[in-house]
Amino acid sequence: MVMYMNGVLHDIFPKESDIPTEYQLADIHQTEYLINGEIRHWKGPMQEVRSPIFIRTGNGLEQKRLGSYPLMGEKEAMEALRAAVEAYSNGRGKWPAMSVADRIDHVKEFVGRMKKQRQEMVKLLMWEIGKSRHHSETEFDRTIAYINDTIEAVKELDRLSSRFTSEEGVIGQI
């Protein structure tokens, strides 16, 4: 009975070649990172990323390898933090000083680029956290909707805060 169960359990996991092409995901090896507006190339240790989903291999069942990312340390973290603090510049940096309309334009551009990556993002969600395609698509679409709703809320807040009001004979802009 144990041998039978092991065989049945083993057989429910696909081989890599059994995975439909539209759901296959090439290894992603992220060697670049961004600090202070500069894309840098990491030459240090890497962290391997594996899916919670197992596949059948010649060595038995193994978690599907998804890729790797830089395993940075305190030095890089502090450098990134310093760059972020300098960029913010106590609210006088480029982004915080930018007009609401310009910030919205940048976020919209980001959303447009993100939408072009929808299928890849959906596959990543499927492999990284084991969601179904439908749930991964729903999560992606919900994220886009949330960003768009946030943009609309920021526009409304900006409109409301730009109004003139009159109180007790004093006219002022709020």
Set out the residue ranges of the language-model regions.
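Long amphipathic alpha-helix in the N-terminal Rossmann-like dinucleotide-binding domain
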Residues: 74-85, 104-119, 133-160, 164-172
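Short intrinsically disordered, low-complexity coil segments enriched in acidic
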Residues: 1-2, 171
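Short Gly/Pro-enriched turn/cap motifs at secondary-structure boundaries
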Residues: 38, 173-174
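Short, structured beta/alpha segment
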Residues: 2-127
